[in-house]
Each structure stands twice: as C-alpha cells, then as structure tokens.
UniProtKB/Swiss-Prot annotation:
Name of the protein this chain belongs to: Active regulator of SIRT1
Keyword rRNA processing tagged: no
Keywords, sorted A to Z: Citrullination, Nucleus, Phosphoprotein
Role this protein plays: Part of the small subunit (SSU) processome, first precursor of the small eukaryotic ribosomal subunit. During the assembly of the SSU processome in the nucleolus, many ribosome biogenesis factors, an RNA chaperone and ribosomal proteins associate with the nascent pre-rRNA and work in concert to generate RNA folding, modifications, rearrangements and cleavage as well as targeted degradation of pre-ribosomal RNA by the RNA exosome. Acts as a chaperone that specifically mediates the integration of RPS19 in state post-A1. Direct regulator of SIRT1.
UniProt-annotated stretches for the region Disordered: 20-66
Encoding gene per record: Rps19bp1
Subunit structure: Part of the small subunit (SSU) processome, composed of more than 70 proteins and the RNA chaperone small nucleolar RNA (snoRNA) U3. Interacts with RPS19; the interaction is direct and mediates the integration of RPS19 in state post-A1. Interacts with SIRT1.
GO biological process, one term: ribosomal small subunit biogenesis
Subcellular localization: Nucleus, Nucleolus
Length: 143
C-alpha cells in the first residue's frame, strides 16, 4: 500500500475514535451546537482534501483494497451457463462449424492429407508382374 492510503486509513480511524462529549456537559441552546458541528465537519473535510487532488474526495483504503482484490467469478459463470442451456438443432451446429473452417491453413492441411492417403492407396497397386521383375533382374544384373 502507498503511504497516502495508509495515512488516509489512519485519519479515518482517528476520526472514529475522537473523544465524544461527556454526558454531564450540556449546551445552552441548539444553535451553537449546530455551528460547532458544522465547523468540525468543515475542518475534517479540509483535512481530508489536503492530501488529494483539487475537488476530489479521498477514498477509503479499505474500499481501494477490496476493489483491487481478485474476484472469483466461477459461481456466477456456472449459474449463467446452467440457466442458459438450450438445445440447438444439429444442422445449425454443423453450419456454424463449417463457417468456422474457412480458408485457414490448418483446415487446408487436413484436406490435403486426406487426398494424399487416397493417392497412396492408388499407388500401392503395381502394374508390373513378378515375371516382369525377374526378366528385368536378368537383363540388368546379367544373372
């Protein structure tokens, strides 16, 4: 925490622990009490505004800490996902998947590998017979 946040937190604690009027003391009339209350409020306001930007009221250190703390959104997300369960027709899901398979390179590779496998299967069959190989062997190696 920064020093300014610590200072503001201490000021808030000091203001809440300020000495209160003793029950035995009673003011003569209501108007001076209002004036003193207003004067105290203005003084505390000026003290708070002293360490902040002009016209901006300082925020409490606790509120700043809670705002910056990580929040767990798991419960809210699970509630949303379970409440929004809707079945979509198979044709719609297939259409969405097909639209997402556009002209990306990864999609092209899948299409090419399927074609290569088919070509390899065609190439596995041979045109030459065993007699042709033996004839070639005799002619080439001379045995």
């Amino acid at each position: 925490m920064s020093a300014a946040l610590v200072r503001r937190g201490l000021e808030l604690l000091a203001a809440s622990e300020a000495p209160r009027a003793v029950p035995g003391q009673v003011q003569a009339s209501g108007t001076p009490a209002k004036r003193t209350r207003r004067a105290r409020a203005k003084a505390s306001q000026a003290l708070k505004l002293r360490n902040s930007a002009k016209g901006k009221a300082p925020k409490s250190a606790l509120a700043e800490y809670q705002k910056r703390q990580c929040r767990d959104h798991l419960k809210a997300n699970l509630k949303f996902m379970t409440s929004m369960r809707s079945t979509v027709p198979e044709s719609v899901t297939q259409q969405i998947l097909q639209q997402n398979q556009g002209r990306k390179a990864c999609d092209r590779l899948v299409a090419k590998t399927k074609n290569k496998k088919k070509k390899k299967k065609k190439a596995e069959g041979t045109v030459f017979t065993e007699e042709d190989f033996q004839k070639f062997q005799r002619e080439y190696f001379g045995s």
